[in-house]
């Protein structure tokens, strides 16, 4: 890596494709004496990421470009709006990087993962956020399959769980906190 911004997400995604491998993270330029079987280097360059990989038989490069949305309103943003915009931009960057890395890892290994490139988040939580944003189940399914590369089976499971959670929570003021205990 050339920075630590998305280290955990990238590490977990590589670990999912190579569960038996010993994975090391480095922020130093390698001197060519690296003994790793497979080497990835992620570099951020303005609005894009460059992912370089090298193994015994193959060397290549792929890139992930972040396309910034443009606002027709040139009014200055408030501090809160700036923080929200920065948080949204960071999420978009992470999503694009993980998508591109997942596609590369799929190409290198021939494997796919049922939960796609989702690491570090409960898929049902993601589906719940989309439900609360007013999306239909079919729109959520399409978003999860296209953006996060989740399998149709796992997409259906996440949406089912999110709808059940929403039904359970509909009469609870969960935005101000709640406790839920499962007793068997």
Model regions and ranges:
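Glycine-centered flexibility motif
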Residues: 1-4, 116, 120, 134, ...
């Amino acid at each position: 890596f050339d920075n630590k911004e998305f280290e955990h997400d990238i590490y977990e995604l590589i670990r999912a494709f190579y569960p038996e491998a010993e994975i090391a993270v480095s922020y130093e330029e390698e001197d060519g004496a690296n003994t790793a079987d497979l080497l990835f280097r992620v570099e951020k360059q303005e609005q894009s990421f460059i992912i370089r990989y090298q193994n015994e038989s193959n060397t290549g490069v792929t890139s992930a470009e972040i396309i910034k949305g443009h606002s027709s309103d040139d009014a200055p943003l408030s501090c809160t709006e700036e923080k929200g915009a920065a948080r949204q931009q960071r999420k978009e960057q992470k999503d694009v990087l993980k998508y591109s890395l997942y596609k590369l890892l799929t190409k290198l290994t021939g494997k796919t993962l049922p939960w796609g490139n989702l690491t570090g988040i409960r898929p049902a939580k993601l589906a719940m956020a989309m439900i609360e944003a007013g999306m239909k189940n079919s729109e959520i399914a399409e978003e999860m399959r296209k953006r996060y590369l989740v399998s149709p089976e796992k997409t259906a499971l996440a949406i089912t769980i999110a709808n059940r959670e929403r039904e359970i929570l509909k009469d609870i003021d969960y935005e101000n906190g709640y406790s839920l205990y499962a007793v068997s």
